[in-house]
From Swiss-Prot:
Residues at the catalytic site: E210, C244
The name this protein goes by in its record: Aldehyde dehydrogenase family 3 member B1
Role noted for this protein: Oxidizes medium and long chain saturated and unsaturated fatty aldehydes generated in the plasma membrane into non-toxic fatty acids. May have a protective role against the cytotoxicity induced by lipid peroxidation. Short-chain fatty aldehydes are not good substrates. Can use both NADP(+) and NAD(+) as electron acceptor in vitro, however in vivo preference will depend on their tissue levels. Low activity towards acetaldehyde and 3,4-dihydroxyphenylacetaldehyde. Able to metabolize aromatic aldehydes such as benzaldehyde to their acid form.
Species in which this protein is naturally found: Rattus norvegicus
Gene name as annotated: Aldh3b1
Covalent lipid sites (S-geranylgeranyl cysteine): C465
Length: 468
């Protein structure tokens, strides 16, 4: 028996009845999300600490505050986002009404990963709600403590005839994907992304895929090594490196590597102390499977910093690898952990060639005191996002779209981009039932004169007297 059938039917009936369409309903659900975040802040922080050993600081910055900001932005702008968008007209339609209507798709499925289990649930959910959809949330079964709150507490703040949280692992997710949805939003790795896309293709369901990849970080010789080290170490080891936009490797000259390694050691010691394992600010690996995978990568190249691990705590020290070969496993897969390989190149051209012969990344970073170098990297490469002289701060701007390209994903969200993602852009033209004399120009029998007049009328963007 299909355990999802009844619930999905209930949600679809609610959507078809128009329950989610009004601005008032959407605003009420968004306010519910806001109350959920404020009422359960401590409980959420405790769950994130239990799942990932996240500090209260990292939980606030990367999970709670970002989610709250998205809710607040949607509430402030909901009515303006929902308004019909007027468009330009040609001469033939000057007296008509032409506009784009942003209508909800219908029943949306959001599949969430474990690394930012609150952020990556609520941020797309805000967009889906604001756009007027009914939603099925599938949180990750791996981040168990956060999953429990999302399943047991979040529904109390939403209209349960329009929103549902479903639980389970890969088998249940596979069963869920057999059903027809009107939109699917998936965040996770490329392998599973292909499975989700294949399932969506059976029903021709539109989809957003937020995937990952190996994000490059180029460091120019003219940089201050300590400034670069501070910034790179922070966003590499944030959440124990389990971040889809974290730098996966650094490209720099041999000279810069020799300056960067001690600077990275200084930054790591400053951030996490002489024994990072005792630091309350360093996360842990999510589970045993990923811990063992990361341990295997520690054998690549040569360990310049860190390399220690503790299986009992699923702890891996902030690690820097040097003398890494491009063919080694650490350079063939997304690391998704607190390991940073340094790869030496002779110049900027070689670095760009190295980047371009790999799959397009979700994010790309470049450090230089020369703006021309930053502009060259930006102009000669492709990635989902780009940040010069820092890391993943572009993620904090709701005015910038977030998403991948190629194997790092498709589709965009954050801020109004989330609303647009979950909205069908419906092209609308409302014409007069009268004035049939003018329309006679387009009817048979066709003449060359009528063709000339009609072509002018269809091309002109404003009124014109030159009709003949």
């Amino acid at each position: 028996m299909d355990s999802f059938e009844d619930k999905l039917q209930q949600l679809r009936e609610a959507f078809n009845a128009g329950r989610t369409r009004s601005a008032e309903f959407r605003a009420a659900q968004l306010q519910g999300l806001s109350h959920f975040l404020r009422d359960n802040k401590q409980q959420l922080q405790e769950a994130l600490a239990q799942d990932l050993h996240k500090s209260a600081f990292e939980s606030e910055v990367s999970e709670i505050a970002i989610s709250q900001a998205e809710v607040d932005l949607a509430l402030r702008n909901l009515r303006s986002w929902m308004k019909d968008e007027k468009v330009s007209k040609n001469l033939a339609t000057q007296l008509d009404s032409a506009f784009i209507r942003k209508e909800p798709f219908g029943l949306v499925l959001i599949i969430v990963p474990w690394n930012y289990p609150l952020n990556l649930t609520l941020v797309p959910l805000v967009g889906a709600i604001a756009a007027g959809n009914c939603v099925v949330l599938k949180p990750s079964e791996i981040s168990k403590a956060t999953e429990k709150i999302l399943a047991e507490v979040l529904p109390r703040y939403l209209d349960q005839s329009c929103f549902a949280v479903v639980l389970g692992g890969p088998q249940e997710t596979g069963q869920l994907l057999e059903h027809r949805f009107d939109y699917i939003f998936f965040t996770g790795n490329t392998y599973v992304g292909k499975i989700v896309m294949a399932a969506a293709a059976k029903h021709l369901t539109p989809i957003t895929l937020e995937l990952g990849g190996k994000n490059p970080c180029y460091v120019d010789d003219n940089c201050d090594p300590q400034t670069v080290a501070n910034r790179v170490a922070w966003f590499r080891y944030f959440n124990a490196g389990q971040t889809c936009v974290a730098p996966d490797y650094v490209l720099c000259s041999q000279e810069m590597q020799e300056r960067l390694v001690p600077a990275l050691q200084n930054a790591i010691t400053r951030f996490y102390g002489d024994n990072p394992q005792t630091s309350p600010n360093l996360g842990r690996i999510i589970n045993q499977k990923h811990f063992e995978r990361l341990q295997g990568l520690l054998g690549c190249g040569r360990v310049a910093i860190g390399g220690q691990s503790d299986e009992g705590e699923r702890y891996i020290a902030p690690t820097v690898l040097v003398d890494v070969q491009e063919t080694e496993p650490v350079m063939q897969e997304e690391i998704f952990g607190p390991i940073l390989p340094l790869v030496t190149v002779t110049n900027l051209d070689e670095a760009i060639e190295f980047i371009n012969r790999r799959e397009k990344p979700l994010a790309l970073y470049a450090f230089s005191k020369r703006s021309q170098v930053i502009k060259q990297v930006l102009a000669r490469t492709s990635s989902g996002g780009f940040c010069g002289n820092d890391g993943f701060m572009h993620m904090t701007l709701s005015s910038l779209p977030f998403g991948g390209v190629g194997t790092s994903g498709m589709g965009r969200y954050h801020g109004k981009f989330s609303f647009d993602t979950f909205s069908n852009q419906r092209a609308c033209l409302l014409r007069s039932p009268g004035m049939e004399k003018i329309n006679d120009l387009r009817y048979p029998p066709y003449t060359s004169r009528n063709l000339r007049v009609l072509l002018v009328a269809m091309e002109k963007r404003c009124c014109s007297c030159t009709l003949l």
